[in-house]
């Protein structure tokens, strides 16, 4: 079975378009919502992102970053083909057909290991930023919303969060027991 759309309990729909050929065959590359708006989902491969980073470094006169052209086929989370969503464009709006944005609605940057690094809005403003553990792929150690302080995370030896630290306010600690997790705030 192939997912071709969704309908919520209010009858609102999303219809998915999948790529028929090429390196993104079978991947969702377009969405139409119930209002008839059409969105293009821009996907990239790890090899494309690595080459783009190398070209940017060359253009800036810097040494190219050491970014692999592929990611490990399998991670603790399952298979990873290296394909990531890089941008979402509004391509058709029946209410405003002549007033489509000249930039993507949202854009995503990824780390060399395929982790989400940043989210940008349509003005190009960074709205979110993520930092990951160098030793453990996919383990987020910090994130920040635009205009807010960075939230940091600490983990125990089994990979469970033990502390969420906000330097400007409310922080949390997590204690794990057999059938219970106790969360304590800094107040």
Give, region by region, the residue ranges found by the protein language model:
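Extended charged/polar low-complexity repeat regions
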Residues: 1-187
């Amino acid at each position: 079975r192939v997912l071709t759309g969704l309908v919520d309990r209010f009858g609102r729909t999303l219809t998915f378009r999948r790529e028929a050929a090429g390196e993104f065959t079978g991947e969702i590359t377009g969405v139409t919502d119930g209002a008839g708006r059409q969105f293009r989902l821009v996907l990239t491969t790890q090899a494309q992102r690595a080459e783009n980073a190398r070209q940017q470094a060359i253009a800036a006169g810097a040494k190219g970053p050491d970014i692999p052209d592929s990611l490990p086929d399998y991670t603790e989370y399952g298979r990873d083909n290296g394909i990531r969503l890089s941008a979402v464009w509004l391509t058709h709006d029946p209410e405003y057909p002549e007033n489509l944005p000249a930039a993507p609605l949202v854009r995503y940057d990824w780390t060399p290991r395929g982790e989400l690094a940043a989210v940008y809005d349509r003005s190009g403003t960074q709205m979110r930023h993520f930092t990951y553990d160098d030793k453990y792929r996919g383990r987020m150690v910090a994130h920040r919303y635009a205009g807010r302080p960075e939230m940091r995370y600490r983990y125990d030896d089994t990979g469970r969060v033990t502390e969420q630290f906000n330097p400007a306010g409310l922080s949390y600690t997590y204690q794990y027991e057999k059938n219970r997790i106790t969360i304590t705030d800094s107040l």
